[in-house]
């Protein structure tokens, strides 16, 4: 466990999933700067994209209500974990997506998301539903701030001014303007490889083209059995391909991004009736019993928010091994340099290469009988 000191108060914070001995912190310099310099008045605060609940824990006190919105299922788990660790009982309403509230917040605190389209979409919603002039504070590490961020904030906020940098982090102050970006909430494009229309919410990768890793795995799916899991489904391209290749299959599509699962649901409904698939918002496969799947397809992430890590991939591999029937297969794609073959060999006892490109490798392991 690690400790963050804010105004003489010490918070105990953990990342999620928790990995004992992991040196990575559950907060960064932008979180600490926001908690000490946000300058928002007393009253209800709306918090967006708080990775592990550090902002919520730091702003919590009995007289304040917090509205907390995060697309990430793991962020919700991290928040619950850290509220409990710090014995915080502040009134707090949690949702995966922005929704109308009976009261208006006195201010909005936004942790800069990895996808700038998500920030634009969030500011559009806030400008549409909350009063003009509501204070907004955006917190980010300088290395995470793209060159297009100043233009975006000036277009959608009034009175925009950045703070001085502290420990390589910065705050951007502004006020809701009532203006809109003109960006569609859901974008759609025709995927030639699947011959179907794909729709995407802003926080989903592959908004106008196939993810390169998914493209390689699509070309090397192999035989599709009856019970398939698409682990980390994203927009659902692997699920769609599985259903197209075996009309009798049933696909369980899982992702920790709420917007990914909503995108996947829309896309699957275009190709099959609901009895052939189920889409779940969750962390890996922790919610299902073992020995149910014939095949797990996986294109695992190698980052959590802005941090490079293989912890999530390892969790996915362990869950895949647990839920596969004896003789069931895990087929996955990953960057060659990540060395996933060693992890699969350790877990399954073997691993074989199905295909490789200069950047990606498709690997398969079979659960022993």
From Swiss-Prot:
Compartments, as annotated in UniProt: Cytoplasm
Enzyme class: transferase
InterPro entries, alphabetized: DNA_methylase_N6_adenine_CS (IPR002052), rRNA_m2G-MeTrfase_RlmG (IPR017237), RsmC/RlmG (IPR046977), SAM-dependent_MTases_sf (IPR029063), Small_mtfrase_dom (IPR007848)
A Gene Ontology term for the protein's cellular component: cytoplasm
Transferase as UniProt keyword: yes
Keywords, sorted A to Z: Cytoplasm, Methyltransferase, rRNA processing, S-adenosyl-L-methionine, Transferase
Catalytic activity, reaction form: guanosine(1835) in 23S rRNA + S-adenosyl-L-methionine = N(2)-methylguanosine(1835) in 23S rRNA + S-adenosyl-L-homocysteine + H(+)
Primary localization class, coarse: cytoplasm
Signal peptide from the UniProt entry: none
MF terms (GO), sorted A to Z: 23S rRNA (guanine(1835)-N(2))-methyltransferase activity; nucleic acid binding
Gene3D superfamilies, sorted: Vaccinia Virus protein VP39 (3.40.50.150)
Keyword Lyase attributed: no
Enzyme Commission number, as recorded: 2.1.1.174
Similarity field: Belongs to the methyltransferase superfamily. RlmG family.
Chain's role: Specifically methylates the guanine in position 1835 (m2G1835) of 23S rRNA.
The name this protein goes by in its record: Ribosomal RNA large subunit methyltransferase G
Native organism: Magnetococcus marinus (strain ATCC BAA-1437 / JCM 17883 / MC-1)
Gene it is expressed from: rlmG
């Amino acid at each position: 466990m690690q400790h963050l000191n804010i105004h003489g108060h010490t918070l105990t914070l953990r990342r999620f999933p928790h990995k004992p001995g992991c040196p990575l912190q559950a907060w960064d310099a932008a979180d600490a700067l926001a908690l000490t310099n946000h300058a928002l008045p007393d009253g209800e605060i709306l918090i967006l994209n708080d990775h592990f609940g550090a902002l919520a824990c730091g702003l919590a006190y009995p007289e304040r209500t917090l509205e907390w919105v995060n697309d990430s299922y793991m962020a919700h788990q991290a928040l619950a974990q850290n509220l409990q660790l710090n014995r915080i009982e502040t009134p707090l309403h949690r949702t995966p997506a922005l929704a109308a509230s009976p009261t208006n917040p006195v201010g909005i605190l936004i942790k800069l998301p990895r996808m700038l389209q998500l920030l634009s979409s969030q500011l559009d919603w806030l400008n549409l539903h909350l009063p003009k002039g509501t204070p907004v504070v955006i917190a980010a590490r300088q290395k995470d701030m793209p060159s297009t961020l100043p233009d975006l904030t000036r277009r959608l906020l009034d009175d925009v001014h950045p703070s001085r940098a502290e420990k390589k982090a910065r705050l951007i102050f502004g006020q809701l303007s009532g203006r809109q970006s003109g960006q569609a909430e859901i974008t759609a494009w025709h995927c030639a490889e699947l011959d179907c229309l794909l729709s995407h919410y802003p926080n989903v990768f592959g908004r106008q083209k196939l993810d390169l890793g998914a493209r390689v795995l699509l070309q090397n799916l192999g035989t599709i059995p009856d019970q398939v899991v698409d682990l980390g489904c994203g927009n659902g391209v692997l699920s769609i391909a599985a259903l197209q290749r075996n009309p009798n299959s049933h696909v369980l599509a899982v992702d920790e991004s709420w917007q990914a699962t909503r995108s996947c649901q829309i896309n699957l409904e275009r190709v099959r009736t609901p009895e052939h698939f189920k889409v779940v918002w969750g962390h890996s496969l922790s919610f299902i019993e073992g020995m149910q799947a014939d095949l797990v397809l996986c294109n695992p992430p190698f980052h959590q928010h802005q941090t490079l890590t293989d912890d999530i991939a390892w969790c996915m591999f362990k869950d895949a091994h647990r839920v596969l029937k004896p003789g069931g297969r895990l087929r996955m794609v990953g960057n060659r340099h990540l060395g996933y073959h060693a992890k699969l060999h350790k877990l399954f006892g073997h691993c074989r290469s199905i295909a490789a490109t200069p950047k990606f490798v498709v690997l398969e392991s079979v659960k022993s009988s």
